[in-house]
Amino acid sequence: MKNFLCEDFLLSNETARRLYHEHACHQPIYDYHCHLNPAEVAQNRQFDNLGQIWLEGDHYKWRGMRSAGIEERLITGDASDYDKYMAWAKTVPQTLGNPLYHWTHLELRRPFGITNTLFSPDTADQIWHQCNELLATPEFTARGIMQQMNVVMAGTTDDPIDSLKHHKTIAEDDTFNVKVLPSWRPDKAFKIELDLFADYMHKLGEVADIEIRRFDDLLSALDKRLAHFDAHGCRAADHGIEIVRYAPIPSEADLDVLLARRLNGEVLSELECAQFSTAVQVWLGKRYAQLGWVMQLHIGAQRNNSTRMFQLLGADAGFDSIGDRPFAFELAHLLDEMDQTNELPRTILYCLNPRDNEMMATMIGNFQGGGIAGKVQFGSGWWFNDQKDGMQRQMEQLSQLGLLSQFVGMLTDSRSFLSYTRHEYFRRILCDMVGRWAENGEVPNDLSLLGPMVEDICFGNAKRYFEERV
């Protein structure tokens, strides 16, 4: 019987163990999509205590605490960091079977070195003091943790109107060897249905020094900001798409009318929203191809389901879930609009509903080519799927319907500096899956064949994919 979280955690056979310990575990981390605050890296934030670094902004933990009956004051309210931390300690023993239990103990092990101690109300004070002592040292600042965890690149998520001043500060500091690069998140520019769309057009116009009145004005403003992002090292865009919209692109004159009506406060029809969204996203995708960027499409979240809590706390507070709208037709046509002129950029497709895994794994095969290995990717298990079953399902379906060997692997998608252990979690699951294939005779039990593939999935593929500007 294995002990909990031993060195061979999640590794069920000898081949898996060798793949992990000899090939996977020492690979650097290329965290190409996250939600870290670049200001905290630029300023090298020193966290005051474990509660602060562990619970600030982590809606995974917040959802678990609510389910365990913790009152909101102890989650997002005005309670002290210590009281929130103790509420989390009360919650963790109730999370058995949930990845939160694994993640919590992995995060204590790395970087804090706490092993053989289960986190609970009984051990919480001891762990609090031990971790707080470490957090007061230079090795446990925001930058120190990234370096300890062997991170070589972190791709943040940034609005086109952002100044990117913090990325500039980081890039100019020769004492810090981790690349922190912006990623372009233009959702507010193509979601014309948003209540604050007109306000956003004004802000975008101010930053770009262009008054946005016509569709061409919008594209000119976006183009100026694309150049700004590119100059600051941006190599990826990310579109958060709750509903995949597609409609044939109307004339520019018609798009001018749609934009003018919306800026005047009119509510557009679903078809008109789809026309505008398609026009902007197709134009953006073609520009990404010209710049050599990667386009990421995160599809299928159903957001802000609780009106009461949205009004109280705003977005990204733990009240989102998996959507179930079909979107294969719209997605295929959206990608095809770019591909028809051979201007589809390298693209990663993520789905939140695992029902869509096989569809997505076959969709990517429609648009491969151009001599680029894995040009269109089926992204790693995202959000509610970045747990053992979800990640394994995604990789198995990719391997059966595409090429696992070209997969760009894991990303944290997190706001926390302690989330890098999710790369370890992913690597163990990957090695166990490939190891089982080998032990069952489904693939050759040849580490000279399997080892390099695992190394590429853990690091090499992502580095090549994001750094080759083609």
UniProtKB/Swiss-Prot annotation:
GO terms for biological process: D-galacturonate catabolic process; D-glucuronate catabolic process. It holds the Pfam family UxaC. InterPro entries: Metal_Hydrolase, Uronate_isomerase. It catalyses: D-glucuronate = D-fructuronate; aldehydo-D-galacturonate = keto-D-tagaturonate. The keyword Isomerase applies. One of its GO terms (molecular function) is glucuronate isomerase activity. HAMAP family: UxaC. This is Uronate isomerase. The lineage of its organism: Bacteria, Pseudomonadati, Pseudomonadota, Gammaproteobacteria, Vibrionales. The gene is uxaC.
